[in-house]
């Protein structure tokens, strides 16, 4: 149950009722009532500017309108202790904080379900993310996209959306031919035969490893077979090796997928031809200079796009169009693609394609993931010390731990550049945000263990009104009560970093409370029981928040 959210809605409704009772405007003229938390505590718990909004319609000074609303406002119905009119016409509400005590039993009863809502109303949403070519290791951009995509998927599901997490396997096209040719070269080299890598080949250590494995497993068997047969086998072998590695890395990073969708299946099922036929029937295909073009300018793209080149090969765009048509045919009403910053220019043509297929282009949303810069000892890390090549996702996980990587990558909007301080990420100090948040969970877990040793329990008949006696307790209760609204907002605005910020704020409120108040006081058993219920609610809420961003909640540190 969302106690704070319900109270806010009741407060808004009472404001609407007061406007009506004061005869200021007709109900249909009343704008949305907005509540804000004032920056300064002296200005109350909530404030509204409704009087300023109504001034033009009611043809009265905002302050006079505010005073009329206050006169008709029934404070007792909504736990308001005091109301003030401030400045040009702000109405400030000072709450009777006893209503906040209901937050604690609501959390204890809900447990892992605390924070859930139905703002998504079961809407079918597909989140497609990572989708790295199966031709090498996952790099830092993939890792950040994985963290953002998975956190967003978790948050959407928590908010009542029907979420499918999908990885698009680019297992067709020239890059896969180059993979097969690269494996072939490394295979022959492993057998002692000199064969150069193709011009656009893959030079990673993983390709060397595949070549060695093939040589160990099959000896010179593939030296004597037809090249086409050899490359077909190497293609499948290389793909399976690379994809298994990607799957293992993502599993270690706590990122699950519901669907692994093969690009090759689009060719085999005829879905590419279907998409092309749909565009042709709708009048958005034409032939020019021996190529087949998509008239994307009809939908605001800056130029038309080639789908089939003069040599008969497909551009990347055509299978992508077929893939998005298939997504929409599967019943998803919202397609959220998590793409690297280099794909920014691709968005208008994909939206144009969706519109040309007869769907709402707004069904497609793209979350852009910007670059990650690693820093260690105050200097930028450009290459791995171990391999001399770009740092991989696996290396970063091993260096600083999954929790730190997941937290840091979910700490900022994906569309902002991120400087990742590796020294800070492993520091056991309050300057390290993931340590600070996890330590809050370990701290409340320790308190609950100590209580058990003293045979003290938060269960049973506990007077929770003890929890509104100090400012630190009230701040903690307010923070706990905000969680469902934070999750709902993070889902609707596609902002997983809001949950990360919330976890930090809740941890801060807990540490502040702990430093100011004595939780286990054997001379005040009733107050102690109430505070134990409070810290148990903090434990549950921290666990739930951290779970959404893929970070563990340790009981000891």
From Swiss-Prot:
Q: Can you quote a single GO CC term?
A: cytoplasm
List, in alphabetical order, the Gene Ontology terms for molecular function in this entry.
arginine-tRNA ligase activity; ATP binding
- InterPro entries in UniProt: aa-tRNA-synth_I_CS, Arg-tRNA-ligase, Arg-tRNA-synth_N, Arg-tRNA-synth_N_sf, ArgRS_core, DALR_anticod-bd, Rossmann-like_a/b/a_fold, tRNAsynth_Ia_anticodon-bd
Q: Matching Pfam families, A to Z?
A: Arg_tRNA_synt_N, DALR_1, tRNA-synt_1d
UniProt motif ('HIGH' region) ranges: 132-142
State the UniProt keywords alphabetically.
Aminoacyl-tRNA synthetase, ATP-binding, Cytoplasm, Ligase, Nucleotide-binding, Protein biosynthesis
GO terms in the biological process aspect are: arginyl-tRNA aminoacylation
Question: What subcellular compartments does it reside in?
Answer: Cytoplasm
Spell out the reaction equation it catalyses.
tRNA(Arg) + L-arginine + ATP = L-arginyl-tRNA(Arg) + AMP + diphosphate
Question: EC number(s) on record?
Answer: 6.1.1.19
Q: Which PROSITE patterns match?
A: AA_TRNA_LIGASE_I
Broad class of the protein's primary localization: cytoplasm
The protein's matches in NCBIfam families, at most eight in alphabetical order, are given as: argS
**HAMAP family reported in the protein's UniProt record:** Arg_tRNA_synth (MF_00123)
The record's subunit annotation is: Monomer.
Q: Which family is this sequence assigned to?
A: Belongs to the class-I aminoacyl-tRNA synthetase family.
Protein's name in the database: Arginine--tRNA ligase
């Amino acid at each position: 149950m969302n106690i704070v959210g319900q109270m806010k809605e009741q407060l808004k409704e009472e404001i609407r009722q007061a406007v009506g009772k004061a005869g200021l405007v007709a109900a249909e003229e009343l704008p949305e009532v907005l509540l804000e938390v004032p920056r300064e505590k002296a200005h109350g718990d909530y404030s509204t500017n409704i009087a300023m909004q109504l001034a033009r319609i009611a043809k009265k000074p905002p302050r006079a309108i505010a005073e009329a609303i206050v006169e008709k406002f029934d404070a007792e119905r909504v736990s308001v202790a005091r109301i003030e009119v401030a400045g040009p016409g702000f109405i400030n509400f000072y709450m009777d904080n006893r209503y906040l005590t209901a937050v604690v039993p609501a959390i204890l009863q809900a447990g892992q379900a605390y924070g859930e809502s139905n703002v998504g109303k079961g809407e079918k949403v597909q989140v497609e993310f990572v989708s790295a070519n199966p031709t090498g290791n996952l790099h830092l951009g993939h890792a950040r996209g994985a963290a953002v995509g998975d956190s967003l998927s978790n948050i959407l599901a928590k908010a009542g959306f029907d979420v499918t997490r999908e990885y698009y396997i680019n297992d067709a096209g020239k890059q896969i031919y180059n993979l097969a040719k690269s494996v072939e070269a490394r295979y022959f080299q492993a057998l002692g035969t000199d064969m150069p890598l193709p011009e656009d080949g893959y030079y990673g250590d993983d390709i060397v490893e595949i070549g060695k494995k093939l040589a160990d497993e099959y000896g010179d068997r593939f030296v004597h077979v037809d090249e086409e047969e050899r490359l077909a086998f190497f293609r499948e072998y290389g793909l399976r090796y690379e994809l298994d590695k990607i799957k293992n890395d993502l599993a270690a990073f706590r990122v699950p997928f519901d669907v692994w969708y093969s690009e090759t299946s689009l060719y085999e099922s005829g879905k590419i031809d279907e998409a092309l036929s749909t565009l042709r029937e709708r009048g958005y295909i034409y032939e020019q200079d021996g190529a087949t073009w998509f008239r994307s300018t009809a939908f605001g793209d800056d130029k038309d796009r080639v789908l089939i080149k003069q040599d008969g090969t497909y551009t990347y765009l055509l299978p992508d169009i077929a893939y998005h048509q298939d997504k929409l045919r599967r019943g998803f009403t919202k397609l959220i693609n998590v793409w690297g910053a280099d794909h920014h220019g691709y968005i208008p043509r994909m939206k144009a394609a969706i519109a040309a297929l007869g769907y709402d282009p707004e069904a497609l949303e793209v979350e852009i993931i910007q670059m990650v810069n690693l820093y260690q000892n105050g200097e930028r890390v450009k290459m791995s010390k171990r391999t001399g090549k770009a740092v991989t996702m696996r290396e970063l996980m091993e260096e600083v731990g999954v929790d730190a990587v997941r937290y840091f990558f979910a700490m900022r909007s994906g569309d902002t550049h991120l400087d990742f301080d590796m020294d800070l990420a492993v520091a056991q100090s309050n300057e390290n945000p993931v340590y600070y948040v996890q330590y809050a969970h370990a701290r409340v877990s320790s308190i609950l263990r100590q209580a058990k040793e003293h045979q003290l329990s938060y269960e049973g008949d506990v007077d929770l009104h003890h929890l509104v006696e100090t400012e630190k307790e009230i701040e903690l209760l307010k923070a706990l009560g905000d969680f469902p609204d934070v999750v709902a907002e993070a889902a609707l605005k596609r902002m997983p970093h809001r949950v990360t910020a919330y976890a930090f704020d809740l941890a801060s409120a807990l540490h502040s409370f702990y430093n100011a108040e004595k939780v286990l006081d054997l001379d005040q058993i009733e107050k102690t029981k109430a505070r134990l219920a409070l810290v148990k609610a903090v434990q549950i809420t921290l666990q739930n928040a951290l779970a959404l961003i893929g970070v563990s909640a340790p009981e000891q540190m």
